Regions:
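Short glycine/threonine-rich loop-to-helix capping motif typified by GTGT followed
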Residues: 55, 151-156, 186-194
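Alpha-helical scaffolding within the catalytic cores
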Residues: 119-132, 158-166, 192-196
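Aromatic- and acid-rich polysaccharide-binding/catalytic face
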Residues: 134-151
């Protein structure tokens, strides 16, 4: 990987690690007494479809609308509509900032327009980060994601295991371990959060 190298974990470099990855490696090193290397791709606020390929999303009728809807919206950005959409976003953001200063409770932040350049788009991280590191030999994966899919729990139940299967196939190392974190409770009134926690349970049992 260009301009990238292994770094020894020290008090100076430790803050660069994702917390889950750091403590996982620390405990593994303690148990095995061997060097533990971590290739981390820490990107917060992502959906599971950002980590899957276009081929996978198009292969299933339940996933296909994700990529088709995104392509339709992104094409509109390229056809001269983006400036109008972005202007609306800026105005909404200004109103959000004003209301946030006046109120203590959470106010929904407007969603920034997401064109084809945005790495958080569907398939975005699969086409960038994953493609760069997939040649590396691994002992397994650790994965912490799901908050951004809480409103689509039923779809996540099917797409997440499909993503796991695709990752294993991409690395070509057989049924290597895939460990993931069940989402903790979060200070929110939405019913979707607990739903996604429950949905992850069958996946955990199958793995």
């Amino acid at each position: 990987v260009p301009e990238t190298s292994w770094k020894t974990c020290t008090p100076e470099t430790a803050p660069e690690f994702a917390a889950v990855a750091y403590y996982f490696a620390k405990n593994l090193h303690k148990d095995l007494n061997i060097p533990i290397g971590i290739i981390q791709l820490p990107v917060g606020g992502t959906t599971v479809e950002a980590w899957t390929s276009r081929k996978l999303l198009l292969s299933d009728k339940d996933f296909r609308p994700i990529i088709e809807r995104y392509d339709s919206i992104a094409d509109a950005y390229q056809s001269g509509e983006y400036e109008k959409i972005y202007d609306r976003y800026i105005k909404s953001l200004a109103e959000y900032n004003k209301l946030s200063a006046e109120k203590k409770q959470y106010i929904g932040k407007p969603t920034e327009p997401m064109g084809k350049w945005n790495f958080r788009r569907p398939v975005g991280l699969s086409e960038t980060m994953l493609n760069v590191v997939s040649p590396y030999t691994l002992k397994g994966f650790i994965f912490y994601q799901g908050e951004s899919n809480t409103a689509r729990g039923a779809q996540y139940r099917k797409l997440f295991p499909a993503m796991i299967k695709e990752w294993r196939a991409s690395w070509g190392q057989g049924d290597i371990p895939f460990l993931f974190v069940q989402l903790p409770r979060f200070e929110t009134k939405t019913r979707y959060w607990l739903s996604l926690i429950h949905i992850s349970e069958p996946t955990r049992l199958r793995r």
